[in-house]
UniProtKB/Swiss-Prot annotation:
Gene: RPO35
Protein's name in the database: DNA-directed RNA polymerase 35 kDa subunit
Keyword Endoplasmic reticulum appears in the UniProt entry: no
Keywords, in A-Z order: DNA-directed RNA polymerase, Nucleotidyltransferase, Transcription, Transferase, Virion
A GO biological process held by the record: viral transcription
Family: Belongs to the poxviridae DNA-directed RNA polymerase 35 kDa subunit family.
One of the Pfam families matching this protein, by short name: Pox_RNA_pol_35
Organism: Vaccinia virus (strain Ankara)
GO molecular function: DNA binding; DNA-directed RNA polymerase activity
Length: 305
């Protein structure tokens, strides 16, 4: 019998500075948005609004929006969840299956419901207190992924709720919603001594390998773009940016990308320190090829799960 959820690890042995570069890139670039734009529309439960919003913010949405991973990571798409639930004598709890899940196209603000796996019925979110016929508890709320712009156009697409109530409650809380992009990394990644390890969760209802490939492809593209955009100051070294003096051969390392790339070519650098190093040894295209080969190796390892 296949379990709905399994914990696994994907391990590849790489040159240590390259492994560190990929780990740091993953942690800094692969940002899965949280549901931090939450609005409670109605609540007669014993849990206060803040408790509901905190619980909903951290719903593991990647296992629901798995068909849209790449566009969510590039922020071409966002998503929202909606819950409207009343306590009954027979149903005295709420699971993740009780929510409706929608993908948001950020170009058009179109809102499209996605299918939800029946396995979500096994994930408990809230238990109501003892049922009483004359005081049944209800909850209605909506939460958007971080970075979603709430405007008249997108609100007009929320045909499943009372727009007047939404506008009133949103106006009450919008000043306390964090304007920054709030996110989590999809996986824990470590790289001790070049042993790059992804700790992942595999679910039975979707093709994890395909989703993992979407993530690694996004990461590789973002890292290569960052490499091409990276600059090292040439001339007298100062301690505000990474800089190199060709006459003295002194390199000042002030960022992680410089540190990892020069270490790949034989330097033993640390952040915020000076090193004597011949920068002509650095071949950016060779480093990019090594990065692409490493990503292929990671995907090959994931296929063995």
């Amino acid at each position: 019998m296949q379990h709905p959820r399994e914990e696994n690890s994907i391990v590849v042995e790489l040159e240590p500075s390259l492994a560190t570069f990929i780990k740091q890139g993953f942690n800094n670039l692969v940002k899965w948005p949280l549901l931090n734009i939450g609005i409670v529309l109605s609540n007669t439960s014993t849990a206060v609004n803040e408790e509901w919003l905190t619980a909903v913010e951290h719903i593991p949405t990647m296992k629901i929006f798995y068909k849209h991973i790449h566009k969510i990571l590039t922020r071409e798409m966002g998503f929202l969840v909606y819950l409207k639930r009343s306590q009954s004598e027979r149903d005295n709890y709420i699971t993740l299956y009780d929510f409706d899940y929608y993908i948001i196209d950020k170009d058009t603000n179109s809102v499209t419901m996605v299918d939800k796996p029946t396995e979500l019925k096994e994930t408990l979110l809230h238990v109501f207190q003892e049922y009483r016929l004359k005081s049944s508890q209800t909850i209605e709320l909506i939460a958007f992924s971080s970075g979603t712009v709430i405007n008249e156009d997108i609100v007009s697409k929320l045909t499943f709720l009372d727009v007047e109530v939404f506008n009133r409650e949103y106006n009450n809380v919008k000043t306390i919603i964090d304007p920054d992009f709030v996110f989590r990394s999809p996986f824990i990644v470590i790289s001790p001594m070049g042993k790059l390890t992804f700790f992942v969760e595999v679910y039975s209802w979707f093709d994890f390998k395909s989703c993992f490939k979407d993530i690694i492809d996004f990461l590789e593209g973002a890292l290569i773009a960052n490499i091409h955009n990276h600059m090292i100051k040439v001339g007298n070294c100062d301690e505000t940016v990474s800089s190199y003096n060709p006459e003295s051969g002194m390199l000042f390392v002030n960022d992680l990308m410089t540190m990892n790339i020069v270490n790949f070519f034989g330097c033993n650098s640390r952040l915020e320190s000076y090193h004597r190093f011949d920068m002509t040894k650095v071949d950016v295209e060779l480093f990019i090829k090594a990065l692409s080969d490493a990503c292929k190796k990671i995907l090959s390892a994931s296929n063995r799960l």
